[in-house]
């Protein structure tokens, strides 16, 4: 192998890594933004949260723990050292959302598919930038 070939392969590999990292930040940023808005809307107890609570008989305070738990999970996910734990917590939160949507038959298909897609994107963004997550899939 010539020096030129080796240099080209190294440059291509570095460019691919850079592109994957950029894509991972875009995916994680968009998902994080959506989840942050969801968390804040629960914490501010916006009208849609109040309407949902009233429709299904949930207590008025119900949206606050949801906003707090999602906010904590999101913060843990955004810290690189604890990102995997955050992804697990967010997946659990979204799994609960799926279960509630199916149980209450409220947006059972759209709501569940959307929550599932969010969970997949959380892990996909993490997989692109974290070798620990890649190692889980390659063993």
Task: For each feature predicted by the language model, list its residue ranges.
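Charged, amphipathic alpha-helical interaction segments
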Residues: 44, 58, 97-100
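Extended, low-polarity transmembrane helix blocks
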Residues: 2-37, 79-139
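Structural signature of hydrophobic alpha-helical transmembrane segments
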Residues: 52-66, 111-116
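Short hydrophobic/aromatic segments of transmembrane alpha-helices and their interfaces
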Residues: 32, 46, 66-68, 116
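Core segments of alpha-helical transmembrane spans in multipass integral membrane proteins
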Residues: 37, 58-76, 91-92
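Short juxtamembrane and helix-loop transition motifs at transmembrane-helix boundaries
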Residues: 43-55, 70-81
């Amino acid at each position: 192998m010539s020096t030129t070939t080796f240099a080209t392969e190294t440059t291509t590999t570095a460019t691919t890594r850079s592109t994957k990292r950029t894509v991972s930040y875009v995916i994680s940023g968009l998902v994080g933004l959506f989840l942050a808005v969801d968390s804040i809307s629960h914490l501010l107890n916006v009208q849609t949260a109040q309407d949902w609570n009233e429709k299904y008989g949930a207590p008025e305070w119900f949206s606050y723990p949801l906003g707090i738990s999602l906010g904590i999970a999101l913060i843990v996910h955004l810290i690189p050292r604890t990102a995997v734990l955050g992804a697990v917590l967010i997946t659990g939160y979204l799994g609960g959302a799926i279960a509630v949507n199916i149980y209450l038959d409220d947006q059972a298909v759209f709501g569940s598919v959307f929550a599932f897609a969010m969970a997949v994107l959380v892990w996909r963004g993490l997989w692109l930038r974290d070798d620990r997550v890649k190692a889980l899939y390659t063993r």
